[in-house]
């Protein structure tokens, strides 16, 4: 009985120490995050990065995500992409990490990686308006208007009076020679934003 009592006391002591350690770790990480925000607000990204590197844990999604953003803002694009990728590896369904990855990937000119990131987001959330819009814009910029059309069409189906979606859907229809559809859409844009220069320009190309 005495042996059992001692075992229970030791187990409780170890549990208390474990919880205390976790509490101390969280406090240290929270302090590092707080300081990183203060440095970020003042524009001192290197110091914000240093604060988090002091408590860096490669298994922490939050720390990797935050460092991905800070290193991107500091202009360390390759390092930023690596942190975001680590966050994605830790949380494969994270949409925010995938969006984050597109920032340094875009800055580095890795457009295939950017497109793949948006496609991965749409596998998880097919109705994501931001991913649909940005992916459509990439295809539009590459003059792949047929592919761009399906992404803008989805946005307009979800948000029929959204300015950005309507405008790009109108221009894409125009580029594909669908003048009647484009005319209707440009006029809807003008209901949303009267005197919109882009919509007026588009209508001028039809008439």
Positions of PLM-derived features:
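Mid-chain, structured segments of secreted extracytoplasmic proteins
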Residues: 61-112
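Structural signature of tandem alpha-helical TPR/SEL1-like repeats
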Residues: 41-50, 74-86, 107-120, 141-154, ...
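Terminal, low-structured helical/coil segments at or just beyond the last alpha-helical repeat
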Residues: 26-28, 175-207
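Structural marker of alpha-solenoid helical repeat scaffolds
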Residues: 56-58, 90, 124, 158-159, ...
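Bacterial N-terminal signal peptides
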Residues: 10-18
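Alpha-helical segment of the N-proximal tetratricopeptide repeat
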Residues: 28-57, 62, 66-73, 103-106
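Helix-start (N-cap) detector for alpha-helical repeat units in TPR-like alpha-solenoids
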Residues: 29, 61-63, 95-96, 129-130, ...
């Amino acid at each position: 009985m005495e042996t059992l009592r001692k075992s229970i006391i030791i187990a409780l002591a170890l549990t208390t120490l474990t919880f205390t350690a976790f509490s101390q770790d969280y406090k240290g990480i929270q302090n590092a995050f707080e300081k990183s925000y203060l440095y970020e607000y003042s524009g001192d990204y290197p110091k914000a990065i240093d604060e988090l590197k002091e408590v860096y844990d490669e298994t922490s999604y939050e720390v990797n995500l935050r460092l991905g953003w800070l290193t991107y803002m500091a202009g360390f694009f390759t390092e930023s992409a690596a942190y975001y990728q680590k966050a994605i590896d830790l949380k494969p369904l994270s949409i925010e990490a995938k969006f984050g990855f597109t920032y340094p990937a875009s800055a580095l000119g890795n457009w295939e990686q950017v497109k793949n990131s948006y496609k991965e987001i749409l596998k998880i959330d097919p109705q994501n308006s931001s991913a649909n819009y940005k992916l459509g814009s990439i295809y539009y910029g590459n003059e792949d208007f047929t592919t761009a059309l399906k992404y803008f069409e989805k946005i307009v189906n979800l948000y029929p009076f959204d300015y950005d979606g309507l405008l790009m859907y109108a221009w894409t229809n125009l580029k594909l020679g669908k003048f009647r559809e484009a005319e209707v859409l440009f006029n809807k844009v003008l209901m949303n934003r009267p005197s919109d220069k882009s919509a007026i320009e588009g209508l001028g190309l039809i008439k």
